[in-house]
Structures are given as C-alpha cells and as structure tokens.
Amino acid sequence: MRVAAQVLCLSGSLRRVSSNTAALEAAYRLAPSTLELLLYKGLGELPLFNPDAETDPLPSAVAELREAVDSADALLIACPEYAHGVPGAFKNLLDWLVGSPDFPGKPVLLLNTAARGSYHAQEALAEILTTMSAQLLAARPVMVALPGAGCSVTQVLENADRCAELQVALRLLVEALAAH
C-alpha cells in the first residue's frame, strides 16, 4: 500500500539549465512525506507524434511516458513559452498522451516560472489540457517567478519567496489529492 501520492513532474524545456526544470527539482526537494514527486526526463527521447505509430507496440519512449503518466496520481507541469506558445517538444509529448485511455480526469497543476508571465503559453497549455479532459487543479498556474534561463535548483531553494510559492503548489496538490 502506497502512503504517498505519486506526482509526475513534467518540464516543458529541453534546456540543460532550465528554470522550469529547476523549479520542479526544488519542488521535489521540498515535497512533504505525503507526496512522492517523480521527475520525468524523457522529453527529448520522444519520436515526433504520428497517429500511424499509435499501434501496439507503441514506440518504447512513448510506452514509458504513458506508463509513468498512467501510474501517477497527478501531474505537476512547468512549461516555458516559446514564440508565444507551448514549445514544440512539449506539445509533442501532449500529443502522445491524447490517445492514452487513462489520461482523462488526470489531476494537473501548472507552474508558471516566467518573471514576465508567459501568459500566451500558459493559456494555450490550459486549453490543450482541458481539451484532453485533464482536471486542472487551479484556475491559474501557480506563479514561481524565476529570473529565467540559467536559474539553478540551488538558487530556487536559497530564495525564501520562491520556496513559499512552491509550497503553495505542493499544498494545492496535497489538498486536491486528499479530496480525489
């Protein structure tokens, strides 16, 4: 019997040093014992989405993604904005999840790490997830205002305001999963 709820953390960035990934790694370190955060690291391994490839067997990277998402109690997503939208690699990940029978109803919480907003991408992401029948846990993404590219997990953890913002997100997850 699992004691902790499993939350799969999905970063929408492929950058080696990503503020979105840093925020998720900081959340991982700050998580209470009632949450087990898992960091998905296969974004760059996914093949381009092709409906013709959605057959048994699925490409191995896609099967691993779907298994990780299906076994998670919730998703925590931090995604950057690129050209006023969701980056292509992350949209590709979402496209592979559309056909997953276990995705509809999946609880999802969004983090917004952009100091300048990234509202276009956040709105597009919420629209995509709503279309996929995700259960968005908050009307708006939880703001964790980081300075941008090159922000490390250490910098996040050393900033009391950013840690407090991440704690808000973690509390939302705990409360939502307790009620789920």
What are these regions (language model features)?
Residues 42-59, 151-152:
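N-terminal beta-loop-helix "entrance" segment that forms/cooperates
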Residues 57-133:
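Helix-loop-strand module that forms the ligand-binding subsite of alpha/beta enzymes
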Residues 14-15, 44, 115:
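Short, glycine/serine-rich, charged loops/turns that create anion-binding
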Residues 10-12, 40, 111:
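Short hydrophobic segments within beta-strands
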Residues 28-47:
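N-terminal glycine-rich anion-binding loop in soluble enzyme alpha/beta folds
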Residues 2-34:
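N-terminal beta1-alpha1 ligand-phosphate binding loop
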Residues 7, 20-24, 62, 90, ...:
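A general structural signal for well-ordered alpha-helical segments in protein cores
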Residues 2-3, 135-180:
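Glycine-rich phosphate/pyrophosphate-binding loop and the adjoining helix
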